[in-house]
Amino acid sequence: MAVYTDVAADELADFLKTYDIGELLSYKGIAEGVENSNFLLHTTKGSYILTLYEKRVAVDDLPYFLGLMAHLAERGVNCPQPARNRDGAVYSSLAGRPAAIINFLEGMWPRKPAVVHCAGVGEALARMHLAGRDFPLVRKNPLSVSGWQSLFAQAADRADTVQAGLSALLSTELDYLARAWPTDLPEGVIHADLFPDNVFFLGDHLSGLIDFPFSCNDILAYDVAICLNAWCFEADHSLNVTKARAFFNAYGRARPLSDAELEALPLLARGAAIRFLLTRLVDWLNVPAGALVKPKDPLEYVRKLRFHQAVTSARDYGIGASA
């Protein structure tokens, strides 16, 4: 979450009159994250999150994102629910941006994920994948292998200002991934951005999954690889095998990974590293002046990419022939 677009108090108060969620008491921007503008609202009826969708989110995709949250909640996955305005719509426009209001989930995201958190997110991810099987809408992933070259093009000429040799590293890896990317693994609804700051816990209990603007249809094990990168590495960018094993075991109890998925995992993890390396690099080079946002370090994912390049099998992640 972040704030790129400011909203005036009187403009927000008028906007809220189109909803039945009470009168505005206070609001504040949320600086965490890098994609959309988010505000915590307190009204006479409770607390809510207001999201103004920025750059990478197309308005035509909002029915998918918001509909998916409702679909998952109906099937026992705890995630925010969009509020409908008085016209019955789940999104409209505010400050020149598509905007939606969702209910506030209790909990905190884990600043230093422990083994119990990794197990919790593994189980929740698998249950989300299962719950999404009958979701009727389909959205292709614009940030999968077919979209990485265009992202690279936005940063190629300045990549070496971030780290010497980065442009060549990315070019070589992208060529390899384009040739090797699998096309025959199980697909379905994925979250595609399930980082620690998008998962809430109350104590050790997972209380909700949030932030669905990257959800789409893609390889399920690719979503697993994204979480491996996000949850199971330490601050020095080394893999914590104990965390990885807990994550995979919990996922596998709900949805066992096939041998083909396990075999492809190192490749998928390289792709997951490239995806976030590229988007972080583009963001790092293009943060708007004065934006209330903290760009994330792209070099974290250079180190993770190099780790996965040296991996020979899923056993290097702490799992055997089956999860």
UniProtKB/Swiss-Prot annotation:
Molecular-function GO terms, alphabetical: ATP binding; homoserine kinase activity
Matching Pfam families: APH (PF01636)
Keyword DNA-binding: no
InterPro entries cross-referenced by the UniProt entry: Aminoglycoside_PTrfase, Homoserine_kinase_II, Kinase-like_dom_sf, Pseudomonas-type_ThrB
Single biological process term from Gene Ontology: threonine biosynthetic process
HAMAP family for this protein: Homoser_kinase_2
UniProt name for this protein: Homoserine kinase
Species for this entry: Bradyrhizobium sp. (strain ORS 278)
